[in-house]
Amino acid sequence: MARYLIKGDVSGIQEFIFNVPSKGAARELKARSFYVSLITTLAVEYILDEINCINPDERNKRLFFNGGGNFFLLLEEPEFSQDVMIRWQSFFDAELINDEISLILSYVKLSEDGFSEDWRQLRLEGNRNKLTPLSTQFDQLFTPYNDGHADGNGSTGHWKRTVAFLSKSLTQKNSFKEMESGASLFGRDVAAYLTENNMLEGIFLPQWDQPLMEAVEAHKADNPKPEARDTNKEIEPKEGNVIDFGHLAEFAQWRTGTDLIGVLKMDIDDLSRLFGTEKSETEFALLSEQLQMFFEREIKRLLSEEASDLFGETIEFKHNIYPVFVGGDDCFFIGAWDAILAFASQMNSAFRVFAESLVNDPSFKSVTEPLTLSAGIILIDHQNSDFSSKDGKGGHRTVLMVNVDNFGKGGVNQIKINCGVVDNNGL
């Protein structure tokens, strides 16, 4: 019986997530990131329902990986064919045609010659398909459509209704229980699905709690002088609400005298090449699972810890770092600048331990040397941090650019900081 490995790849993630102005960014960035994960999760549900795969254990067995805007499914004949693939792609294209983001399907027939060649072919197929997004809806690309705020049914503006719902659900305490989303995706009611599967439980964002609120009031009482300048504060400091970027910058100012926001991006080097050396789909699935566990569980553990910043001040990461995107092999964080630097150092140490554990695990025969991370950090003026720039430069003023290459290599735990002031026109 022929078997097929199906890949779903969300295209345009970075442009979609960061196409937001600074005002409201704390509300919307995580919501947009969560929407990306919702696309892959509901696409997997749709495909498994389509092939009548009902048993939960069987569904888990078919799903190799889901994270970072990608998923991999194992299907067999006769449940899968090229015609079925075209029908699924057409359905997803029609659903997402007005969503500023797309889901690209690719597949490869698994051979007896080894998984590495199958993986190479799947990568080539995926890269080709990315060149023609929404190709099944070509005629519809040239028809008028509204901006997504219409109340009517249909596919127009899925993401706007869903992101608006998620923005409030994720940033304001108890709001999820008090409202209905009015949005659907791939035939599922978003609010109902999230409720049934507890998908908003465990989502980490920096939140106000009583000890923090008391500490803030105590600090203000001890330091009665007025603020040096206005701050970009949008969300009420109320227990359970998300801490916005203006307050994160303010916390950094209290500790260091400088109210900057740090932005950290990390990803694993040459991960696709490593997957291409896997000898079997079993090892591929196991490695994918380990990577996903690290980026989801280990990072959540680190965010719950304390650390010392460059000045010896104790920082609680949970009050100072906003994880925008944590995927299967990469992640993106925004936070108080001193907390971001301290967190990057902690991540360095944790990833080294993880990378060494893979080398020493006999289950991963293809992992012969430790994986490495590459990372970059910028420190920006939080009042001018416009994330909506289409050209990727942003409307912010970059104060420091920090390069962290091959994060996991070598025995030296260091971050190189290149100092300089660069405005967005000079990037």
Regions found by a protein language model. Name each.
Residues 1-427:
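Regulatory and interdomain segments flanking nucleotide-handling catalytic cores
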